[in-house]
């Protein structure tokens, strides 16, 4: 009422409506409720946990998107509004394709077993150095014969069990087992270079998060940024994922301490005076 152009943003676990709207939530519960823990892992495995605060970060990203939309709406229509997101809504958005498929099919998109992948050319394999390699060929018949000859197994191309995508699906365990043996012959890095030299194969090594720190693509695209931290000195952090040719984004400062900007926000957004802010402190409001 006092400021009709105010944009107020809130983030919750389960959304502003419904019987659980006031229930607490953490990142792990956001993962659990969203369905993603049953989307990852092998078919017979229990729900698969994901580390790294995925649900928390998705909630923050979606909240930021919502605020930007509200600012744009205010510029166009002259009104503020409330912006709300939740762990649940954000994680559903992240899985938009899977959620839409479930709506159409009334069932989950099935997990894929690595050792009997319906498409052995869309799978991952352990290499001689212990690292894993991912193949991603959605048109496997286009690549299969060339692949078999490239890796020195021409007999697999003429094997009736593997003659087409349908036969390979019906004999998936045998096909994957054969490829398992093949990929143990070289390191992951060697396989990437070898396959790219032999043809237009679609392949990449599977990184751990720590591997990203030394990945040439990460380095050259500046997906890691450096910034000064008041407690830790010069640190590297994940940078903005969007590249802007004329106004490149950068990490200006680290995450703030709890309450670090309370006074600044009250003064700049709320119009509070220093005396009013001091009064709020004495009353224990802030």
What residue spans do the PLM features occupy?
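Active-site-adjacent "lid/gating" segments in soluble enzymes
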Residues: 1-138, 145
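Short glycine-centered helix-capping/turn motifs at secondary-structure transition points
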Residues: 35, 216, 222, 283-284
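Short Gly/Pro-enriched turn/cap motifs at secondary-structure boundaries
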Residues: 112-117, 123-124, 170, 232-235, ...
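Aromatic-enriched alpha-helical interface/lid elements that frame and gate functional surfaces
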Residues: 121-199
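Short linear loop/turn motifs
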Residues: 158-170, 206-214, 275-286
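A glycine-rich dinucleotide-binding beta-alpha-beta segment and adjacent secondary-structure elements
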Residues: 196-252
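Flexible, small-/acidic-enriched active-site or ligand-binding loops
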Residues: 231-279
């Amino acid at each position: 009422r006092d400021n009709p152009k105010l944009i107020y943003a809130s983030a919750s676990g389960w959304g502003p409506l419904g019987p659980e709207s006031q229930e607490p939530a953490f990142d792990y519960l956001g993962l659990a409720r969203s369905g993603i823990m049953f989307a990852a892992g092998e078919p017979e495995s229990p729900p698969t946990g994901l580390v790294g605060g995925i649900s928390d970060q998705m909630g923050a990203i979606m909240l930021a998107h919502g605020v930007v939309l509200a600012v744009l709406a205010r510029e166009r229509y002259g009104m503020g509004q409330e912006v709300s997101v939740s762990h649940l809504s954000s994680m559903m958005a992240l899985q938009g394709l899977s959620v839409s498929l479930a709506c159409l099919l009334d069932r989950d998109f099935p997990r894929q077993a690595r050792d009997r992948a319906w498409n052995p050319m869309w799978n991952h394999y352990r290499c001689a150095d212990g690292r894993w390699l991912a193949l991603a060929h959605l048109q496997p018949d286009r690549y299969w014969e060339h692949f078999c000859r490239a890796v020195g197994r021409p007999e697999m191309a003429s094997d009736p069990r593997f003659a087409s995508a349908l036969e390979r699906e019906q004999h998936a365990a045998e096909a994957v087992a054969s490829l398992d043996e093949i990929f143990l012959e070289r390191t992951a890095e060697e396989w990437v270079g070898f396959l790219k030299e032999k043809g237009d194969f679609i392949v990449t090594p599977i990184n751990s998060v720590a591997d990203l720190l030394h990945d040439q693509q990460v380095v050259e695209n500046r997906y890691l940024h450096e910034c000064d931290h008041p407690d830790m000195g010069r640190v590297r952090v994940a940078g903005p994922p969007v590249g802007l040719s004329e106004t490149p984004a950068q990490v200006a400062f680290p995450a703030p301490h709890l309450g670090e900007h309370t006074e600044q926000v009250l003064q700049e957004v709320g119009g509070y005076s220093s005396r009013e802010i001091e009064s709020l402190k004495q009353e224990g409001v802030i």
